[in-house]
UniProtKB/Swiss-Prot annotation:
Disruption phenotype: Does not seem to affect growth but produces fewer conidiophores, as well as fewer spores on each conidiophore. Displays milder disease lesions on rice leaves.
Chain ranges of the YTH domain: 435-576
Single GO molecular function: RNA binding
Biased composition (Basic residues): 398-418
Protein name: YTH domain-containing family protein 2
Biased composition (Basic and acidic residues): 441-458
Superkingdom of the source species: Eukaryota
Biased composition (Polar residues): 107-128, 169-181, 352-368, 421-436
Region described as Disordered: spans on this chain: 98-128, 141-181, 301-464
Entries under Gene3D superfamilies matching the protein: ph1033 like domains (3.10.590.10)
Function: Specifically recognizes and binds N6-methyladenosine (m6A)-containing mRNAs, and regulates their stability. M6A is a modification present at internal sites of mRNAs and some non-coding RNAs and plays a role in mRNA stability and processing. Plays a role in pathogenicity towards plant host.
Gene symbol of the encoding locus: YTH2
Species for this entry: Pyricularia oryzae (strain 70-15 / ATCC MYA-4617 / FGSC 8958) (Rice blast fungus)
Family, per entry: Belongs to the YTHDF family. YTHDF1 subfamily.
Length: 586
């Protein structure tokens, strides 16, 4: 039992630690460098004792100082001499120096009261530099051996290197956005730049178009447009749907004509629908897809039709009741009283020379717009927009009708916002705001507008965005300022527009200085939307910004999803231009 208990590890369960000899912990578990260093010092002394006759007593005294250590290290074999291959002569000289250091440090060790027992084991005795270097070398070699023998020390750094590899070396799958099927099959997208707003589909990549790129019925290769056309315009005017029927009839034909239908925004569904439609699936499975296409087209056309009615009604209403304050939109250019007030001069236009011409052309354009709408996509209206460059023609009208409290109120962005609302659509809604209630944008912000309908005084136009305030530096006089206001219209129709441009929604009567540098919160985030396009010359590029005929469907502008409920076209561009100039003026 005795050998098993003390030295036979088969009988030791690890709990009876006191049964071992007192020197067990240091003898079997001595891995710390402090014990090794003291052991090395002692072994050097013991190894060199025979050759140190004159100073033998002092070394013995030094050995007594190491009493507790020498007891523990009786059985530890001293490998230091073998490891370092030190000759007897070197050891004797080193031991002599060590003896002197021991004498010097004896007083120091005795002075320390409680740490006296621990000091020999916690740190090596102060020896000369060579001895310490020797000991350090031995310790380093032993530590390296321990590192080789210790699996935990081995695996530790390896794990670190495995977990902390640079990302480039790791075999991670690249985080790429899942590529849409557009890379292989482009989806029918309403493209205003292509002829008649038809969809553009690169048929060179189609499996079922063996004769190369499809030609439109006009004989020109289908245009591919870049820019906004790449975006999915879900609220575009819906072109006619005959091509879908043709596709169903001529399924076996070589060139498949895709119906120019605007998709509803669901990319995968549209790809599947389009594949079904172009003959990748059998006819039985394609019928539901075709039905969905037709339903989409009917819905879109139905949405576009009321708007055209609004436009025609608006033209008639504006021309009939231009004298009335409500319908006249507050801008009667004196010479052309019969012209619908929609003829807004462009900012910085050449002059009033073209005022009458632009008004007349605009009136005829408004009447034609309903008929030309489906195929033109509002391009005719936008073109007519470029024909209205006069500023002075508007002055005579509202100067005699409206007075604005502030000379600044008629600044350009306000004018442009007026322009946004004079378009035929809003003209029908200006009388009172009945059809405006149907427009989602206004419905969303009704509370915000009613908030400010309290002050429907002539000063309300001052809510024009800070752009408005500083827009027309040359026009500071009261006669120009008073021209453009119908206070009711301003509160309802223009103020949400002012908010879109980044206007301070409230504080309408705050002085112009304050409005120029309004508190930054108003200008940041949802109130500080900056227009991407600042010039009315970019009409063709911004046509896709909004469907000109479908005013019932709002367009999301800006990060906050601010809805613009009047169609953009020319008027929105004027608004953008005015706001940009006003915002960036020093």
């Amino acid at each position: 039992m005795w050998p098993n208990l003390f030295w036979g590890f088969d009988a030791y369960d690890g709990s009876n630690f006191n049964a071992f000899p007192i020197y067990f912990p240091t003898e079997f578990m001595q891995t710390e460098p402090r014990d090794q260093s003291s052991c090395q010092q002692l072994s050097m002394e013991q190894a060199t004792e025979p050759s140190m006759n004159p100073d033998q007593e002092d070394i013995v005294e030094g050995g007594e100082n190491y009493g507790e250590l020498s007891n523990q290290q009786e059985t530890v074999p001293s490998f230091e001499n073998a490891d370092q291959n030190l000759s007897r002569l070197e050891m004797s000289t080193l031991a002599r120096e060590l003896k002197e250091k021991v004498k010097q440090s004896r007083a120091l060790r005795q002075s320390v009261n409680n740490a006296a027992e621990q000091q020999p084991s916690t740190k090596p005795q102060p020896v000369q530099q060579e001895v310490q270097d020797l000991i350090n070398d031995i310790l380093k070699s032993q530590d390296q051996d321990d590192n080789l023998k210790n699996p935990s020390k081995l695996t530790g750094p390896q794990d670190d290197t495995e977990t902390e590899k640079p990302a480039s070396t790791l075999p991670t799958t690249p985080r790429t956005i899942k590529e849409s099927p557009l890379s292989t099959y482009s989806i029918p997208v309403y493209c205003p730049a292509s002829p008649e707003g038809r969809t553009h589909i690169p048929d060179e990549i189609l499996d079922n178009a063996p004769k190369g790129p499809r030609h439109t019925h006009r004989g020109q290769v289908q245009m591919f447009c870049n820019g906004e056309c790449g975006r999915r315009e879900t609220d575009k005017a819906m072109p006619a749907i005959e091509p879908s029927d043709k596709t169903e009839e001529t399924e076996g034909a070589t060139a498949v004509r895709i119906p120019p239908v605007a998709t509803d925004g669901d990319l995968e569904q549209d790809v599947i629908m389009w594949l079904r439609h172009t003959g990748f699936y059998d006819k039985a499975k394609r019928t539901d897809a075709l039905a969905r296409w037709k339903q989409l087209a009917k819905m879109e056309q139905g949405l576009a039709r009321p708007q055209q009615d609004h436009q025609e009604a608006g033209v008639a209403l504006a021309s009939a009741s231009q004298g009335s304050k409500e319908a006249g939109m507050g801008t009667r250019p004196g010479p052309d009283a019969d012209c619908p007030p929609v003829c807004r001069p462009e900012q910085g236009g050449p002059g009033s020379s073209q005022a009458a011409l632009s008004c007349k052309s605009k009136q005829s354009t408004d009447i034609q717009r309903a008929t030309l709408a489906e195929t033109r996509g509002g391009s005719l209206r936008d073109r007519a927009a470029n024909q209205q460059p006069s500023k002075k023609s508007d002055r005579g009208r509202c100067a005699r009708r409206h007075r604005s409290s502030s000379p600044r109120g008629r600044s350009g962005s306000h004018k442009s916002r007026r322009a946004t609302t004079d378009s035929p659509v809003s003209r029908s809604t200006t009388k009172s705001t009945p059809s405006r209630a149907r427009q989602p944008g206004h419905r969303d912000y009704r509370e915000y507008r009613d908030d400010r309908n309290r002050d429907t005084k002539p000063r309300s136009p001052l809510v024009s965005c800070r752009a408005a305030v500083a827009f027309n530096p040359g026009v500071k006089g009261a006669p120009l300022v008073r021209q453009r206001f119908r206070p009711r219209q301003t509160n309802t129709d223009l103020q949400h527009k002012a908010r879109i441009v980044g206007a301070p929604p409230r504080d309408m009567e705050s002085n112009i200085k304050e409005r120029q540098n309004h508190d930054p919160e108003r200008q940041s985030g949802q109130f500080g939307i900056r227009w991407l396009c600042t010039s009315p010359l970019a009409l063709q590029n911004t046509k896709s910004l909004r469907n000109s005929f479908d005013d019932l469907k709002p367009v999301l502008l800006g990060r906050d999803g601010q809805e613009m409920d009047d169609y953009c076209g020319r008027d929105l561009l004027r608004l953008m231009d005015a706001s940009e100039r006003g915002l960036h003026r020093p």
